[in-house]
């Protein structure tokens, strides 16, 4: 069977600071747009696509405590548990998870950092590493290297709940920097959006075809 692709569309709308300095770009909207477009392409290609949440519906927010940190932790826990529920339902070996984000170099003001990176958890399996490399190679193919040094493995390692607490191979993509004016122009353009979606699609398909 073809892989089941689980798409996690990043932060909720109430996550503070996740917008460009000029407030013309909001990460949660970008994550959802990429996720939905990617899901449609994968479905058309014959993959089963699942989401950690659907569209603008944000899980459990109406049930969460008022303490903001507790909200974030509960939402994040909901999302990685949802991935593991899908793994149990469809078989861990049949599932892949990609968590879609956009990056920022600082908490305020315009910055110099540019480019896309693909991240894995500290406990990443060989499958996750191979998956990350396949997607990052497509980022390079789309011209998204930016001005950062590229690790030899073509992936970055970080403490990430969506990668470390999920049972299937999992990656997290940080697509360009919304606090860099040049990257922001790409993120806001239709051409740039299509390239980002294609990067994910081609990377996923190439990885699946390599198995």
Feature names for model-found ranges:
Residues 3-8, 16-19, 89, 99, ...:
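Active-site-adjacent mobile loop/cap segments within catalytic or ligand-binding domains
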Residues 2-6, 11-116, 122, 126:
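Catalytic-core regions of hydrolytic enzymes
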Residues 42, 87, 135, 139-143, ...:
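Hydrophobic, Leu/Ile/Phe/Ala-enriched alpha-helical segments that form helix-helix packing faces
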Residues 27, 31, 128, 132, ...:
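Short, charged, low-complexity patches
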Residues 127-154:
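Active-site-adjacent substrate-binding region
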């Amino acid at each position: 069977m073809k892989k089941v692709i689980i798409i996690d569309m990043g932060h909720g709308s109430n996550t503070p600071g996740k917008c460009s300095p000029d407030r013309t770009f909001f990460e949660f909207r970008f994550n959802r747009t990429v996720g939905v477009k990617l899901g449609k392409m994968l479905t058309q290609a014959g993959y089963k696509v699942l989401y950690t949440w659907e569209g603008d519906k944000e899980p459990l927010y109406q049930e969460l405590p008022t303490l903001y940190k507790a909200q974030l932790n509960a939402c994040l826990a909901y999302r990685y548990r949802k991935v593991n529920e899908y793994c149990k339902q469809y078989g861990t070996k049949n599932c892949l998870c990609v968590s879609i984000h956009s990056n920022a170099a600082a908490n305020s003001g315009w910055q110099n950092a540019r480019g896309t990176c693909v991240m894995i958890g500290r406990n990443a399996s060989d499958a996750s590493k191979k998956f990350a490399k396949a997607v990052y190679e497509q980022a390079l193919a789309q011209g998204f290297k930016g001005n950062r040094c590229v690790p030899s493995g073509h992936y970055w390692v970080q403490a990430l709940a969506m990668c470390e607490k999920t049972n299937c191979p999992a990656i997290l993509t940080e697509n360009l920097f919304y606090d860099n004016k040049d990257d922001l122009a790409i993120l806001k353009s239709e051409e740039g959006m299509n390239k980002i979606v294609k990067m994910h699609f081609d990377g996923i398909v190439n990885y699946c075809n390599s198995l």
